[in-house]
Amino acid sequence: FTYGMRKATERLAEHGVRNVSASDYDTLLSVAVAENYIKELEGNIQFVESRLKGLKDEQRPTVLHITKGSDLLMIDGGKSMIGEWIKLAGGKSVLPDEANMMTVTVESIIQANPDVIIIGSSGNKVQAAIEKIKADPAWQSISAVKNNRIYANPTGTFPWDRYSTEEALQILWGHNYSPRKNSKTLIWWKKHRRFTKNITVMR
């Protein structure tokens, strides 16, 4: 405070006017970053929702999300944040009653028969996991394997699929595998670049 500012707050208090002064500008900036992030996240959700209007449940691809490449039987089901972004992106969890990081049997996966398989961010292990699935006779009857629809989940500063600010991008990325996917990849890259620039620059 300067002397004049202190006197001003005293006068306000004398007249019953509540007031607050702040000098922690880092905190104020953090609030601005948070508000900007929420705007970006909600904007991406609305963008995808606008493309999914009229999409029937039976048109949504069933998605199996494998938690990590080192354990192909650990999955994230419909009762998890992963299941939520799958739904927002235009798909539906092939194991809707399972929660987060649950161990299932290969038989239950075969019976569920997912249209799409996504393997959670596993660094340099993810490609080996994809090849292992493709080579394993037990998985060959699954639609996602037969149609070569097995994908590695992206990683940025942190895996996009869980507990990350880049969850805002995850919804856009996941939408690429829905029936209403955005054929104009330029839009996706523009949104990706804008997100990275806006969130990073403001920190």
What are these regions (language model features)?
Residues F1-A32, K39, P96, N100-S141:
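Acidic/His-rich segments in extracytoplasmic proteins that coordinate ligands and/or metal ions
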